[in-house]
Amino acid sequence: MRKIPIIAGVFSLLITSCTFAASLQDDMNILIANLGIVSSSTDTKVITSSLEKMRNAALDAQKAIPPKLEGKAEDSPEIKDYRHGFDLLIEQIDKTKQWAEEGNIQEVKKSVGEVINIRNTYHSRYR
């Protein structure tokens, strides 16, 4: 009889872990889909909306820990660097959103390149 609660506890941990990992993947999918929209659109309302979605996904993903860093302490250099990457990304998204709100599409397009550079740098480390 004692085995049932133990087994139930193990399964709930596994399910929670799988859900958490899916959430990080969902955030990454939101980021990449909306980056494509920002890259190709010239409509400031569409760009601003996509950037807001990107910002929310980045904030959510920043709280997660990718599989490559599982088991690392919260204050480890790797976790701090992972979260710093999202700080840089969010900062760049905010700058890009400001340019979109000002109607400066040329700066928006330049900024997309910087977002891609940040993504590539941190993907190579933690993906």
Swiss-Prot record:
<dbReference type="Pfam" id="PF07361">
    <property type="entry name" value="Cytochrom_B562"/>
</dbReference>
<feature type="binding site" description="axial binding residue">
    <location>
        <position position="123"/>
    </location>
    <ligand>
        <name>heme b</name>
    </ligand>
</feature>
<dbReference type="GO" id="GO:0009055">
    <property type="term" value="F:electron transfer activity"/>
</dbReference>
<keyword id="KW-0249">Electron transport</keyword>
<dbReference type="GO" id="GO:0005506">
    <property type="term" value="F:iron ion binding"/>
</dbReference>
<comment type="similarity">
    <text>Belongs to the cytochrome b562 family.</text>
</comment>
<comment type="function">
    <text>Electron-transport protein of unknown function.</text>
</comment>
<dbReference type="InterPro" id="IPR010980">
    <property type="entry name" value="Cyt_c/b562"/>
</dbReference>
<keyword id="KW-0349">Heme</keyword>
<keyword id="KW-0408">Iron</keyword>
<keyword id="KW-0732">Signal</keyword>
<feature type="binding site" description="axial binding residue">
    <location>
        <position position="28"/>
    </location>
    <ligand>
        <name>heme b</name>
    </ligand>
</feature>
<dbReference type="GO" id="GO:0042597">
    <property type="term" value="C:periplasmic space"/>
</dbReference>
<dbReference type="GO" id="GO:0022900">
    <property type="term" value="P:electron transport chain"/>
</dbReference>
<keyword id="KW-0813">Transport</keyword>
<keyword id="KW-0479">Metal-binding</keyword>
<dbReference type="GO" id="GO:0020037">
    <property type="term" value="F:heme binding"/>
</dbReference>
<keyword id="KW-0574">Periplasm</keyword>
<feature type="signal peptide">
    <location>
        <begin position="1"/>
        <end position="21"/>
    </location>
</feature>
<dbReference type="InterPro" id="IPR009155">
    <property type="entry name" value="Cyt_b562"/>
</dbReference>
<protein>
    <recommendedName>
        <fullName>Probable soluble cytochrome b562 1</fullName>
    </recommendedName>
</protein>
